[in-house]
Amino acid sequence: MRPTKLSVALGREALAARTESANGWLQGTPPGRTVRRVIDGLIDIELADRSMSLAAKIFTSVLPLIIAASIFSNWDLATHAIEEQLGIDSTDLSAWASEYDATDPTFAAFGVLGLLLVAISGTSFTRTLARIYAKIWNVPPISARDAWRWLVVLLLVAASAALIGVIRQVSGPHFVGRSLAILGELAVWAVVWTVCPYLLTRGALSGRVLWATGMLTASGLTVIRAAGRIVLPKLTATAETKFGPLGVVFTSISWLFALSMVIVGAATITKALALDESYLGRYLRGPSAGA
């Protein structure tokens, strides 16, 4: 046998041995089985496809609601937070908004009706999120009889953006202020993403699983947003220079895609941890499930 062929054969044998060893660890040890469940869960939920679908719904449902609400309320803090994240210059938007008087009766009546329609159409985001949770946790999807849950979750997610804007404004620019802002943001996300799966699964999950999902989601979102504040403004400026407004759209959707991957991935990982054979899994399942 030639040396080249011998090297290839030895390489294949080594790869097969490593693969067999990895499979043995994944199937033969509790941590390995948990990792295997995480991988299988992410594949089964189709992480990339679900995240892109959720990101598109956020872009077309949640952001319009925040922008529309900012015209009639103090939710401009939410839009400023988004602008700061992406590095968008809001001068043109502010000039456009200043041309309209929200106190005018005709404009106010049309605006309230439009805001209501935006909120109703915005439930497409929460319907998509509900289907994702239903598939992950194997629970029945929400029917039209529980449609109020869709609207409550939508308003909760939108309001959290405004609340985070308030926290960032109050905290100030100093190091201590930034630390408080991060902790406040983490707390807001933890509450929001504990309540959201509770509502969208109709209370089918235990409190421990809900809090674990909320904390894991909040941690991921906080890290992504912190990193985004560093890299996104430059990326947005570059994309806008090269592609114009479409560049801002592409960058925004990419950012929302990363956030959506955290939302979907955190729920999937929490389920895998809840099925773990260790103390953590037994704790998340609770006394009744472990009996």
Question: What does each of the following model-derived ranges do?
Answer:
Residues 1-291:
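Membrane-embedded alpha-helices and immediately adjacent juxtamembrane helical segments
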